[in-house]
Amino acid sequence: MASDKSLLRMYGKYANEILSLEPEMKKLANEDFAIKTQELRDRIANGEHVDDLVVEAYALAREAANRVLGLNAYKVQLVGAIILHFGDIAEMRTGEGKTLTGLFPAYLNSLTGKGVHIVTVNEYLSRRDSEINGQVFDLLGVSVGLNGTRMPKNLKREAYHADITYTTNAELGFDYLRDNMVVDKEHKVQRELNFAIIDEADSVLIDEARTPLIISGGSSSRINLYKAADEFAQKVNEKEDIDIDLETKQVYLTETGMKKAKDFFSLENLFALENTEIFHLILNALKAHFTFKEGVEYTVASGEVELIDQFTGRILKGRAYSDGLQQAIQAKEKVEIEEETTTLATITYQNFYRLYAKLSGMTGTAKTEEEEFIKIYNTRVVVCPTNRPVIRKDEPDYTFGTKHAALKKLIQDIKTVNEIGNPILIGTTSVESSEQIARYLEKAGLNFEMINAKNHDREADIVSQAGQKYAITLATNMAGRGTDIKLSQEVKDLGGLVVFGVERNEARRIDNQLRGRSGRQGDPGMSRFYISMEDDLMIRFASPRARKSFLSLGDEHIKSKFFTRAVTNAQKKLEGLNFDQRKNVLDYDNILAQQREAMYAQRDSILWADNLKVVIKKFQITVAYEMIEENSEIVHGEKTLNAEKLLKSIDGKLVAHKRFVAKDFYNKEKMNLAVQLAEAMLEFYKARVIDIPDDVVLQMERKNVLTSFDKYWTRHIDIASKLKAGIYLQQYAQNNPLAVYVEQATELFNKTKIYIASEVVDVLSKIIIRDPEQNVESQKIEITDEIIDDILKSTGLTKANINNKDINAKFDELIAKADNQNDIKKLSIQRDIMLGLVIEIQKRRENSGNKTVNLGKEEIDQMLAILGIDNIGSTSKEEIISKYEEKLKLAEDDKTKNLINIAKDVIIALYEQIELIKKDASSLKSVIDDDNDGGEVAKTRIG
């Protein structure tokens, strides 16, 4: 691998060539830029490699930026832009012009026609950068899209299909997950993941890598268990019942703690399989109480627990801890406990960004994490030289025994600097810390602006003003990243921006980012950190002896290079722990990632296929093979097929009646027999849908295949998540948890594929059965809401017209106007379906006393409206009968009377269902999964 030095030397030559083309570019008229862009596109289309166009494309974009924005890219910016094009991370100091730098590789790679994504950490930066650079791209003849939250799908699709798309990291990931849940290819918004340029790459690819993106749905209620676990956590004696690993922030029960837990929950064995869930909830409750602090990891606002980004201090909107930890914190804070949701789709940032054909990024600090970038993303970190030398003075740390002493000295120094007039930026590690310092500043009578997770609305505005004379700005970590703090000449003459850090951060690069807010573009400046033995980092890593010796200092402090090195070593150790944690998340997610990619690829092929018979046949082979296995028995020590039993299970159900006799199955190799059975299944299925137009069959097949896919994939990731949550217990059995997880998750995935195949084959065998010799009444038609809605929409019928007379009249009219035989056949089938619906409604009337109501909300609302009932929940059976009799008296024709009778029968049946549910709602029943997927036991509330 080439060194930074050799890469910079090579890229410097590229940059010199680009600069040498400036006179030639100056000669171009404005309208020539789009023409030149098209020429470059044509050359790529004709086989020229995009790498060979770096010099020409960058020279063209540089001149365009100069004309539109008045900005002439420096050589170092061009070097940074070349680093990005070749798929690496460019470390560029604050103020070196990353926004302009990203313009060049975006333009060059957009010429391939495959799209470029420029990823930012928030929507403000996406909007700002798209507006600034969008003017340049417009001159170049390149389209720009802006993606954001709550945008309608058509606008999202338009944004993603632009040559260059600006978007936030979270929305980009969620759009990917949502795209892989659609049932119609037209509903997808993204195209291929070609090239991503990530602004603040360390924040996105490192800091947020531990928290996966999750789309949830459905819910399961364990509120009482969360409350019980929280009550137990409150009774725990911190010294006797638990051990807290301060380095990893894990909590473990001691022997006395385990005994207390067994007594509290009346359990004989805390580690028994059936108690895995409650043990997991206990540990979550202990974490919530003893390692998570309000104002540090999360904040409570308007009765909701909101996560705080540990590296930026921003609120992580829409994000929540998984595996029940969010609910444990809600129980601790006495706010409403949300019902735990089922994970419908999930992916980590690590695995998402590895899907891109090429990945690059920019940030002010990433070199300290280069090992992680190489191992996880296969990207190097190349440090760009600054345009002007850095003259900022980074003063040695002040170290104190107590926090109070550190803050007392900090306030003294702030007063001194403020009297001179230098602007001051105070960086803190948490909301709690910033609010503590705010109280000290207020007490000292100092005016200041504050940005933290509770006060982030004016973030960019406050940061942009932080370079004014006498300004004091208090911010959590790197709030305001992406917004420059610009200084007037007067402030520069005073010595520039002064940065004070209150305690060291978990990672050295975060400290460097804070320092880097001062001294941009060769400006003067100064930085210093105030450390105390009561800081979180010191509590976790400094020895008790060292902490005790510092307490003797009182209000005094020391400046020691030895101690500064010790702090740096502690940070390195913590960086290693955090990397291990992220690597651990990735190791487990890699298993799911392989399965997810396989599922999504097959799902995509189903969405785009013009014919699904090949897919269906594969499912039928799987089902046939499983049926052969299920119908085999051990006879004289050998597994032998019970041919009669197999024949009985498929004859007339999955294959044509009398298609096989038992002897056809004798002496056949299993896979050959499975293929033979699958071919017969496919023949049988094709015969059943032979009279239905191909487009209707394809739509029906696609809908049912995707429904089964999504149902069992959702179930798979939910079970895999629970499996992962408890897998660490394998350590106690001297097993490797990851190896066990791989084995069990693979077995689970194989079963999931079998479940999907089984359901698809079963559902398709029952959808529509047509026999031309049978009359309408004897045809068996399964009617779905989608089919009915499509027919109503295409024919102009309404739900009020669902009677034999209106249906026949409408279809006679439409058939008379039909242009071809295929349309006539389609209309005839639709007529049969609608007449079948009338029969189903009549049957429902006749059997409403012992049938459940399976109508949708709209149909039920219509029935209630017919009888004039507002709310069935507050209505008695007698009132329903009374309303029915009133309406029947007012009815003027048989059609209206018929509807009133149907409405009465349906509403009474629904009323009886509700009463039954109310009666049984409190009973709990243990349900063991019928599919035997590893003995998962769930508590299900009846009703």
From Swiss-Prot:
Gene3D superfamilies assigned to the protein according to its UniProt record, in alphabetical order: Helical scaffold and wing domains of SecA (1.10.3060.10), P-loop containing nucleotide triphosphate hydrolases (3.40.50.300), SecA, preprotein cross-linking domain (3.90.1440.10)
Binding positions (ATP): 77, 95-99, 484
Subcellular localization(s) per the UniProt record: Cell membrane; Cytoplasm
Catalysed reaction, written as an equation: ATP + H2O + cellular proteinSide 1 = ADP + phosphate + cellular proteinSide 2
Gene Ontology BP, a term: protein targeting
InterPro entries: Helicase_ATP-bd, Helicase_C-like, P-loop_NTPase, SecA, SecA_DEAD, SecA_motor_DEAD, SecA_preprotein_X-link_dom, SecA_SF2_C
UniProt KW Repressor keyword: no
EC number per UniProt: 7.4.2.8
Membrane-topology descriptor: Peripheral membrane protein
Keyword vocabulary terms for this entry: ATP-binding, Cell membrane, Cytoplasm, Membrane, Nucleotide-binding, Protein transport, Translocase, Translocation, Transport
A family per Pfam: SecA_SW
An example molecular function term from Gene Ontology annotations: protein-exporting ATPase activity
Entry GO CC: cell envelope Sec protein transport complex; cytosol; plasma membrane
Family membership: Belongs to the SecA family.
Function: Part of the Sec protein translocase complex. Interacts with the SecYEG preprotein conducting channel. Has a central role in coupling the hydrolysis of ATP to the transfer of proteins into and across the cell membrane, serving as an ATP-driven molecular motor driving the stepwise translocation of polypeptide chains across the membrane.
Record text on subunit structure and interactions: Monomer and homodimer. Part of the essential Sec protein translocation apparatus which comprises SecA, SecYEG and auxiliary proteins SecDF. Other proteins may also be involved.
Protein's name in the database: Protein translocase subunit SecA
Organism: Mesoplasma florum (strain ATCC 33453 / NBRC 100688 / NCTC 11704 / L1) (Acholeplasma florum)
